[in-house]
């Protein structure tokens, strides 16, 4: 009699770490229960990213995202998605020191069903990571192009183009791994150094704009489903013309209403 493996009820950090060098990790962003429920059976990881400040609230950057905003949207995502590993971004200013970071990370765990929190920064965040993990918080690291540093960097700039940057990125990755991060997001990093980091560290890397050699990939859902036509980063592949499809559907609806074709008899009560 053949033994069948029971489906995973909830993806854990152990499941993701076991995929290292074995199977690619599939990750996507989500900000509400509806899309989280749609994505649930198809992905390993859902990130409730502070990118929602741009794609959901139409702001120019992520910096004005608040802890309350992240908690609200994380609750919504957790209500819709039951299986994926759910990561909540710690917004700008929410981990400026250990006391503040611990307070906000504990709120994420107490008030939502998130699996982990994510913070941006390299080896300078190692001590903070240790403090959080010592309290039982799973931390996901994020190095390379860091959106919360966009004003300091003078824009969204690819990292790893010179030897100095490459050395720092590798040092950051190794330091964060030693400090206890469970996963590491590599954003906007040149392919060779992203590959080297992935090979050097034992924890999985999840890339966005960092080449195909990372242990997994993540995209902002509204980018990959074609909801924005004003700007598309080089690394984004559109799998759907979502904006066009929805606008066409709304046009048909409006046309039916104007012509008196909606609702019809079958859609009315008598």
Swiss-Prot record:
Localisation: Cytoplasm
One GO MF term attached to the UniProt entry: magnesium ion binding
Lineage top rank: taxon: Bacteria
EC id: 2.1.2.11
Record-linked Pfam families: Pantoate_transf
Binding-site positions, Mg(2+): 50, 89, 120
Active site (catalytic residues): 187
Swiss-Prot/TrEMBL catalytic activity: 3-methyl-2-oxobutanoate + (6R)-5,10-methylene-5,6,7,8-tetrahydrofolate + H2O = 2-dehydropantoate + (6S)-5,6,7,8-tetrahydrofolate
Cofactor note: Binds 1 Mg(2+) ion per subunit.
Keywords in alphabetical order: Cytoplasm, Magnesium, Metal-binding, Pantothenate biosynthesis, Transferase
Matching NCBIfam families: panB, PRK00311.1
PANTHER family per UniProt: 3-METHYL-2-OXOBUTANOATE HYDROXYMETHYLTRANSFERASE (PTHR20881:SF0)
Role of this protein: Catalyzes the reversible reaction in which hydroxymethyl group from 5,10-methylenetetrahydrofolate is transferred onto alpha-ketoisovalerate to form ketopantoate.
Subunit structure: Homodecamer; pentamer of dimers.
Name under which the protein is recorded: 3-methyl-2-oxobutanoate hydroxymethyltransferase
